[in-house]
């Protein structure tokens, strides 16, 4: 791992200010500005209304804190156009997610490299794509693997991948099919012994800023963080203990999920369930996480649930 010192006065660009981007920016903007740096944020041109007012109060708060917004439609932009937008920034943190469509993450990464950006945090805030590899049943994950390969094949731009597991809230998304608080059901993906790592967006934002600032500087490394790593059996116990309710339990086995996927190959949530039922790459021990090793507290599932039930 190459090490170098953080410089004051850095120009940082964040791509996206949605759920994760806003969480990252809440910690990042004050940290960078205190060091005489600047933060710019690329968002869609649709982020303003017809009167040129910001549609999001969060965007307005970030602007008031000193961040500058740049309207760019990344999905419709070429690599060359993005290269021009990215040129001159010291660090780019990609919080765009998958909403911009297939191929976008590779396009962004190529533009970052062609622009000669010093340091890049790609959109890899998820599972361990190196372990998952290709053919997981989730096509966008194949692209994530390719992004990692592209970064490792070059030596101009430093990169940092922050692996977070699932957003904690996603476990409780009814469409995902794991915990449904309204219907009081819990399904294990693959089996009750299977494990999953989760982190809240607020913790991801705070930890990403800490990793960005850390000395010696972290470069060319996958950094694992987590709010909690749990088995589905322990998850069921946690949910019932916190809610003081009894939940109906079920298991979605890998063969059953594969058969459902054969019948409904374009169902995105079903593809997620198939991928997580594999187990490999979906979790890591808390003792291996950067936050645990640096004694930084994070929100576990019980704490998250107490504030969201």
Task: Annotate each language-model stretch with its function.
Residues 11, 90-91, 119:
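Structural motif
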Residues 50-115, 129-132:
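NAD(P)H-binding glycine-rich loop region in Rossmannoid oxidoreductase-like domains
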Residues 69, 119, 158-159:
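Hydrophobic beta-strand scaffold residues
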Residues 95, 123, 165:
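Conserved residues at the C-terminal ends of beta-strands
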Residues 254-309:
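A hydrophobic C-terminal alpha-helical subdomain
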